[in-house]
């Protein structure tokens, strides 16, 4: 049973606040030196631990630098496919794929992959067809914040026109249609686009989403834990805690959940804070930013509730060790 809030703060926060302060100092110092070399500003640091109820940190990049065009641009391509997972009718679907600068279809390099799910009322174009977001991804890679990565933006709607979805069936579409199509077309770390290949490459695959896409990420956790080690739910609560805990107890595979949310103007703020405090106090989870020592972290910002803030959260996730 989760600890009461005041006990939780006494037990968790007091033990870790000094290490977090040291981490922030190191981050600021390292980025200060890096900024002098590259000519762009040190990220703005926000410590919202008092609002989150757990130690947290959030860094905002220099938008003037990151959101301007990059001289090493990646590309965004469209993929079309049919799904047969929803009754007798076949549905036509579209997803978008970000490929990093230098991706060569005839090359041999392999890349980690992120599957990103949009929020309600948005679609697969929302993130990747936004120029500032693509520029930011390009700069994250060119500056070394992130290793070159592939990002895939599908949709959980099987009928986008009528906003129809089925979370019971969508995990099958993800495992049997989306993932095999993407990873047989583009060179991820899956050397074979089958269950064996996906399990062997799970450390290089992440499931991510914003708002309703975050809820999709939580819903996929029990069904994707064997083939993905990283889950990044942004500004969206969990619907089925019992299924998640059961999956954690059943699996012996390590995992890391990097949860993020905006501030008081983010409509998911209160629910995400409550969830973060509950999970951080649960014995199934070890709270903190170290992927070697922990399996859950909460990045709290002062952003509004908007899909495009996902690029800021991914920036923080990369700084905190995603795919490193």
List each model region and its residues.
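Positively charged n-region of N-terminal signal peptides that target proteins for export
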Residues: 7-21
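Sec-dependent signal peptide cleavage junction
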Residues: 28-37
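Non-catalytic cap/lid and distal C-terminal segments of serine-dependent acyl enzymes
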Residues: 36-324
């Amino acid at each position: 049973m989760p600890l009461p809030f005041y006990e939780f703060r006494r037990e968790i926060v007091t033990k870790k606040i000094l290490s977090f302060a040291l981490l922030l100092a190191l981050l600021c110092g390292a980025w200060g030196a890096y900024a002098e070399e590259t000519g762009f500003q040190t990220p703005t640091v926000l410590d919202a631990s008092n609002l989150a109820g757990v130690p947290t940190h959030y860094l905002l990049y220099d938008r003037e630098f990151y959101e301007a065009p990059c001289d090493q641009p990646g590309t965004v391509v469209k993929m079309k496919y049919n799904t047969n997972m929803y009754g007798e009718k076949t549905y036509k679907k579209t997803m978008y794929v970000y490929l990093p600068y230098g991706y060569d279809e005839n090359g041999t390099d392999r890349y980690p992959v992120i599957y990103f799910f949009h929020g309600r009322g948005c679609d697969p174009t929302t993130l990747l067809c936004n120029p500032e977001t693509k520029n930011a991804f390009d700069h994250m890679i060119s500056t070394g914040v992130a290793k070159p990565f592939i990002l895939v933006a599908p949709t959980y709607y099987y009928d986008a026109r009528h906003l129809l979805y089925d979370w019971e069936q969508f995990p099958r579409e993800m495992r049997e249609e989306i993932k095999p199509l993407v990873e047989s077309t583009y060179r991820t770390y899956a050397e074979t686009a089958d269950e064996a290949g996906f399990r062997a490459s799970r450390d290089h695959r992440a499931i991510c989403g914003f708002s309703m896409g975050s809820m999709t990420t939580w819903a996929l956790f029990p069904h994707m834990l064997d083939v993905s080690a990283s889950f990044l739910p942004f500004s969206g609560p969990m619907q089925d805690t019992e299924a998640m805990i059961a999956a954690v107890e059943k699996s012996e595979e390590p995992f890391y959940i990097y949860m993020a949310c905006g501030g008081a103007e983010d409509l998911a703020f209160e629910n995400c804070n409550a969830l973060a405090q509950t999970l951080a106090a649960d014995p199934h989870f070890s709270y903190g930013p170290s992927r070697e020592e922990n399996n859950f972290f909460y990045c709290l910002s002062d952003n509004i509730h908007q899909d495009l803030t996902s690029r800021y959260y991914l920036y923080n996730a990369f700084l905190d060790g995603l795919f490193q």
